[in-house]
Amino acid sequence: MRKSVLLTGVAAVFTLALTGMATVSKAQDLIFLSTQLRPIDEAQKVRDVILKGAPKTSYVVDEPSPFTVRMKAEVEANKHTISLVGALHGELQPLLPMGALDPIDDVAASLKDRGIPAGLMELGKLGTGKQMYIPWMQATYVMVVNKKALPFLPAGADVNALTYQQLAEWGKAMNEKTGQRRLGFPVGPKGLFARFLQGNLYPSYTASMVTEYRSAEAETMWNDFKAVWAQSNPNSTSYDFMQEPLMAGEVWVAWDHIARVKDALQQAPNDYLVVAPPAGPKGRSYMPVIAGLAIAKGAPDRKGAAELIMHLTKPETQLVTASEVGFFPVVNATLPANLSPGVKLLAEGVAKTQTAKDAVVALLPIGLGDKGGEFNKVYVDTFQRIVLRNEPVRATLDAQADVMRTIMAATKAPCWAPDKASEGACPVK
């Protein structure tokens, strides 16, 4: 997918917000429920900055699993409190069969001048003939490089086109010359390391996320990644957001979601480069993150929800969103010359990632419902067993593939890119 076609709340608080609705007048704020921009500082930026000038809105956030449960409960009870929902493509897909989404072709028609790529609008149909969500914002995962690391690049290596072997060699050179392991990954409890394994590492070696989980190529991949991990800062197992170790100088080369490195780039833009993740034998895989806006079936304020979609997709709002929270426009919005250097770096990094000649697209998992956490755990458990505990690669892959098969059979989720389309549950060979 080319650049042109791409790109918690606490349950008690959420419950209180909803239970109060019965006694509030029709003039109350509409409820905008989102799985995105959940951290406290990001949610506050949405309320104070991004929603400025929009219809009066209560912005409520929740984790993906409770979000799905909440939406299902409202449908089953036929008692609707939520007007607008914001979530990832793969989180919106399961809402379709439960009848939780209202078709919004009328809203799509009013957005034709926004320049949202046709490919993204097609994704928003969720495989139907009707528009079910409007693309909201996009992001991906990148590598951030402190320029202090550049003198230690392996001979002949291009920082914008690295391989995993070169990354390991680079890390080894930095370790030998500085006495510290300078590579870093967010393997902490709230880190997004599972997305690295799913979206970057696995498809780069196997052209698959599920089907080839225990393949010979996967075995090679894990052995190669052991060499990368050997040069990674041991504190990586406690890192959640890589911007902190980057700013502290503990790590010079880090992988993470663009929103989780933004502060480091904003603080010292002249110190860093943002580059595409490394490539493996099957290409340079990356995971685009597409968030969408959908109107809930039975929305108490459908008109207000449509107006809020119009506000959030205005070019100026999209640029504010990029500047404030590091998610990039889906509309045709030219990045201004006065854009902060840190955000400009991120924009360049996203472009390098999406337009690499060997780019491979790996979509976020789709159709897993409340099994998404278990799916992620398969990858992290495999990493812990093979890399951290040094268990045999082949035996571990065989055992973990059984766990993966159980999850896919339970969810009946068909394959998604880069795996080939399947009839029924995505198979694990």
What are these regions (language model features)?
Residues D29-I31, R47-I116, P151-P154, W252-V253, ...:
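Extracytoplasmic "Venus flytrap"/periplasmic binding protein-like
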Residues D29-R47, D370-K371:
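Extracytoplasmic "Venus flytrap"
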Residues R38, V60, S236, G349-R405:
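C-terminal capping/gating helix-and-loop segments adjacent to ligand/active sites or protein-protein/ligand interfaces
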Residues L88-T140, A168, L273-V275, P427-K429:
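Hinge/lid segment of periplasmic solute-binding proteins
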Residues D106-I116, V159-N160, Y202-M221, Q266-Q267, ...:
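Short, solvent-exposed loop/beta-turn-alpha elements that line the ligand-binding surface or hinge
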Residues T128-M137, Y141, Q165-T211, E217:
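Extracytoplasmic/periplasmic solute-binding protein
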Residues E169-M174, S208-Y239, P277:
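Glycine-centered hinge/linker elements that transmit conformational signals in sensory
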Residues D263-P269, P281-D381, P414-K429:
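C-terminal lobe and pocket-closing loops
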